[in-house]
């Protein structure tokens, strides 16, 4: 196997291991788990038959070669026997209650209709040894959860299922195939013997869960979120989901920082909690090593009878003084190797004090906008979850300023934020008045004198024959503006079906041998809407629950190699936003309520991706903590909460990954849309953190001038803020699509700013695989390995291609199409922006009782299902409507039953549409 060959067996093994290590066991009475050899197992729940491998949206649209669900893996296990009669009852019911795929993007059901459990089913399973109840939930991009049955809460049918099965079986295990945590009050009410969070484990998820259920892997996952009694117990809930403004009044008291400080009695399962099939003891000590570091030494011993892994968690408690602090802050963790019964492992962690420093945004310590260590006693706690961690040591600390920074992204007006008063009582105080407006500190770099084309090519910079500045001096003003614009989605200039192309997209830029760079959606795998297969990874929450950075790094090393083989330069992930509230639909894509864990896991993913030369784009920078009205809803946050909570994970990933690419959000923070925030994109990223990569917008992002609404044409403020690449346009050469040229001519956007951004982009290009292809410096070994990869993928070069006429219409003949059940028709469509009506003319010789569905996908997103019936040989036409953006799209027609003859399909443009559709 060559150096660049993708070892799919190793890839699958790593994903399977991660899926297993991310499972979190919350309860295990009566030794219900692991399953015993010879057990007869009753599987309940219709979601056993449809596994959620991922959440919804851009992060979930990976075409996979296979998906192993929990039921699939159980059925393949030879050590147990499934109750086939019960399975038959479910399969018969599901035929009459098929899976509901919803109506497309943002309109997919959070859950599926559950089969009511009957006395017949219970009687059928009465002789079985153990019952597994499998429940599922999904949510995702543009689709938050709601505090309703079928979403955050169980439905009555699901409650009835758990109640009846738990009453009949002393060994009942409920398995949750979910992306986010859900309401868990039912555990106490119905008392199932075991409860396991299995999350969404990608294409190997079922195998990983089965390994845990069978005891091949001892559960060792830990919760990355606090599970509280009720959704109303989370302090963010009262300020979540507003369509205009969300006040982060809980401030730094997010997740366990709030509950351990103010509301211990509201916690059902604490942060960091997770059971094992064995038991462990922890002996630890902590002391100050020097003025910068605390040293923790611990011995973890397996005191049980089964081999297993344990997670060591370290928390700091700062002194309470003029600056209030939470009673616990995670500042270190480590996962043991697999320890045999009686075996122990000695762990030493050297923890920088800046991991638990506090930020003073008001000057109450005398040092405004500084990270500080407070005067007093710092106490270190060590254990296996935040609640049971024991004191390991303490030390006296003198007041110390660790880092002088400056105010960024401050609220326009003060608002009341939560504080901790003496006696751990909740108080409120106003955020400080801001000093700087969003444009007060915008720097205008000196311009490089333009020389025109001197014959230099980007390869000359790569070979160090000339400086980057000499190269950029050749670029015209139009070149610099066009370099700012990415194209997509599904640009034909890069790997088919991917999210975007950027850099060398126009003839004038290509003249300088600037390659087109490729970006693909992630972070759950490579999304290629043309049908090319890729590996579907476990979701972000599951990976966080492993607490195993080395395992995650190894897994993403495989993904990095997969990116390189597919000529993708950056994966749009990992997602590093904070689980501020359990109802955020995109929590599955993010990691935790804790910024330290988030940053460490994000850095591990980047370290793996970077090895093969491609990289990741960390997102969404910053504070993308709800999907409802994410383009408009203003996140109003104190500078302290930004610095300690919502930016900290990004900071760790930028510095330790290191990150080379960052994506901003759709919406505003404190009145300024992040795509055009100089504070975020220049001061925080580049000045404070030393970031030297590129920043890109989210797709079709908007910006604003402070105090004004956002506008999709406002791009110049993005470039001035050092957001280097606007994503995405249909044509980078179109100078009328935005305000770039106009603002440049007015002097509001300078040549020096554009040249600075160009240098950022081109420095990224120089480190990318695309540059090696451009210079023809790819090794024969890599070319061979790439040629041998993925032979079963569709040949995009032979795909039908159609271009809209002047009116925007496309007509495709269906003559000769194979429309047997399960067959697909793929086509590459070059469409205009607007509202389309798709008309499909078919006939069937079957009678009118025949059901002949055809599902229509555009760029892997379902647009609708045409529900034909038998027409006794008569031609019939049905239609669906949808909006789309200008550019290339990949259409797929999926035939759900045999019996149709297609005359043609036609796409008719009927009106303009918003680009965000």
Where are these regions (language model features)?
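Short beta-strand elements
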Residues: 389-414
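Glycoside hydrolase catalytic-domain context in secreted enzymes
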Residues: 1-388, 409-844, 853-917
